[in-house]
UniProtKB/Swiss-Prot annotation:
GO terms for cellular component: cytosol. SUPFAM superfamilies: FAD-binding/transporter-associated domain-like (SSF56176), Uridine diphospho-N-Acetylenolpyruvylglucosamine reductase, MurB, C-terminal domain (SSF56194). It holds the Pfam family MurB_C. The gene is murB. The keyword Oxidoreductase applies. NCBIfam families: murB (TIGR00179), PRK13905.1 (NF010480). It is an enzyme of class 1 (oxidoreductase). Cell wall formation. GO terms for biological process: cell division; cell wall organization; peptidoglycan biosynthetic process; regulation of cell shape. This is UDP-N-acetylenolpyruvoylglucosamine reductase. It catalyses: UDP-N-acetyl-alpha-D-muramate + NADP(+) = UDP-N-acetyl-3-O-(1-carboxyvinyl)-alpha-D-glucosamine + NADPH + H(+). Its cofactor is FAD. It comes from Nitrobacter hamburgensis (strain DSM 10229 / NCIMB 13809 / X14).
Length: 305
């Protein structure tokens, strides 16, 4: 358990409207269902509330922002400082205008694809198969099926650590493979995306194809965090893992998925340490077998056990 600093913080922020909780368990907020508590979990009411909070939060207190926890391992001892979780009520709106889609950071990627399809906007179908939020997509340059966030983003909305509301264009995002280099200097609050006019039947067919592929090759009904490692240039991480003999390998309650080797799963009783140790074991075996250093795609946060 961490020291309770919420009373002091609330006294410094009399106009705060969001919810602030001390020592709040984070495991229920992640897809792996593992990990310790946040010293403080803050859910802002809206963008103005978030900006107010950050302006008044002492600079020495660390912060981390999470969405639905679909690409995340929270370590067993939890996180000191403040974890900010953007909720759909204040950050989940999705609207369309011509060939553009405006989405809050808490909007599910799948919902953005559906909104685009309803407006006959093509090019965003790949979001239909990504199990996260737009905030995470901006943070990670999320992609699937040959498309990435950088391909469709016009601009992102964000709040800086100092509490300034800013707009960042595509170039300013400094996109890399599965990363936006501008983070963690900002917290993304939404984005504007541009697609193209397309026939509704073609859009729906593409979305069905994306969903069918995902259900066929990924363990979507397991406690998992999505793709564990980035694909090395010109190679597939899952093929390297399989060739190293790691399909089905276990550490405690964690297992390399039999269905897709680049997915780790919590079989029911795993700890965060089990999952991270399994991932590091996979990395070591692939390095030994193929000479390739796999890089984590899943984010790992919190104190080491």
């Amino acid at each position: 358990m961490f020291a309770d600093i919420t009373t002091k913080l609330k006294s410094q922020m009399p106009e705060l409207r969001g919810r602030m909780l001390a020592n709040e368990p984070l495991a229920p907020l992640t897809w792996f269902r593992v990990g310790g508590p946040a010293q403080v979990l803050f859910t802002p009411a809206d963008e103005n509330d978030l900006a107010y909070f950050l302006r008044h939060l002492p600079e020495e207190i660390p912060i981390y922002c999470i969405g639905v926890g679909s690409n995340l391992i929270v370590r067993d001892r939890g996180l000191p400082g403040v974890v900010i979780r953007l909720a759909p009520r204040g950050f989940g709106e999705v609207t369309t205008d011509g060939d553009t889609v405006h989405a809050g950071a808490a909007a599910l990627d799948k919902r953005v694809a559906e909104a685009a399809a309803a407006a006959d906007i093509g090019g965003l179908e790949f979001y239909f198969g990504i199990p996260g939020t737009i905030g995470g997509a901006l943070r990670m340059n999320a992609g699937a099926n040959g498309s990435e966030t950088k391909d469709v983003l016009v601009e992102a909305r964000a709040v800086s650590r100092r509490g300034d509301k800013i707009t960042v264009d595509n170039a300013g995002m400094k996109f890399e493979y599965r990363n936006s280099a501008i983070y963690p200097s900002v917290i993304f609050t939404g984005g504007t995306f541009r697609g193209r006019r397309a026939e509704p039947e073609a859009i729906r067919a593409r979305m069905n194809e994306v969903q069918s592929h995902r259900e066929t090759v990924q363990p979507i009904r397991e406690k998992t965090g999505g793709s564990t490692f980035k694909n090395p240039p010109g190679q597939s991480a899952w093929k390297l893992i399989d060739a190293a003999g790691m399909r089905g390998h276990r550490v405690g309650g964690a297992q390399v998925s039999e269905m897709h080797c680049n997915f780790l799963i919590n079989t029911g009783e795993a700890t965060a340490r089990d999952i991270e140790t399994l991932g590091e074991t996979v990395r070591a075996r692939v390095k030994e077998h193929a000479g390739v250093d796999l890089q984590w795609e899943i984010k790992r946060i919190g104190l080491e056990a």
